[in-house]
Structures are given as C-alpha cells and as structure tokens.
C-alpha cells in the first residue's frame, strides 16, 4: 500500500511540474542576410542544353532602412547541340533601391 501512495505522489508531482513553462526565454535571432539564388536550364539531346544561374545579394542598407545597394552576378552557357558549346557568359550588375514608406 505504501508503494501505491508513493507512485501516486510521484505521478502528481510530475504532472504539476509538466505544466510549468520554462523560465528562460531567449529572443529569436535575426535571420542571416543570405543571397537569393535563381537557376534554370533545359533543352534536349538534339538541340543541346542551356544552363543559367543568377544571384542577388544586398551589400549595404542605410541606418533608417530606406536606401540599399545590391549586387547581382550571373552565369549562363549553352552546352551541346549542332553548334557545340557556347562560350560562358559571366555578368555582374549593381542596383540602388529607395523605399518610399
């Protein structure tokens, strides 16, 4: 009988402790500034395949968040087909953005 009471007391104490929320609540970290990637391709055996990859990365933002500058590099190439491989096309661009808000 003592064992039964001991088990009941343990079960009740565990049930009470399970309802308590943790006291330590950490703030959610800011998401990292990762680049946006876009890629694509397609084709067939007869005409060859095209491949393209572009990225966009914000490199600077003003303190108030209204002004920002971004960089956009890219690569594309046609592979195979009746005329063979094309030369790779490398490109890079920069852009400025203003938020009217």
Swiss-Prot record:
It comes from Protophormia terraenovae (Northern blowfly). There seems to be a family of diptericin in protophormia. Diptericin A is the predominant member. Glycans are attached at residues 28, 72. The keyword Acetylation does not apply. GO terms for biological process: defense response to bacterium; innate immune response. Induction: By bacterial infection. Residues 1-18 form the signal peptide. It comes from the Eukaryota. This is Diptericin-D. The modification Phenylalanine amide is found at residue 100. Keywords: Amidation, Antibiotic, Antimicrobial, Glycoprotein, Immunity, Innate immunity, Signal. Has activity against E.coli. Belongs to the attacin/sarcotoxin-2 family.
């Amino acid at each position: 009988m003592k064992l039964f009471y001991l088990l009941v007391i343990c079960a009740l104490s565990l049930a009470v402790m399970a309802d308590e929320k943790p006291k330590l609540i950490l703030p959610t970290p800011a998401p990292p500034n990762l680049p946006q990637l876009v890629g694509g391709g397609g084709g067939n055996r007869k005409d060859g395949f095209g491949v393209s990859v572009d990225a966009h990365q914000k490199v600077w933002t003003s303190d108030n968040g209204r002004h920002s500058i971004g960089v956009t590099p890219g690569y594309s190439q046609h592979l195979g087909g009746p005329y063979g491989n094309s030369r790779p096309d490398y490109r890079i661009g920069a852009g400025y953005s203003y938020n009217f808000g």
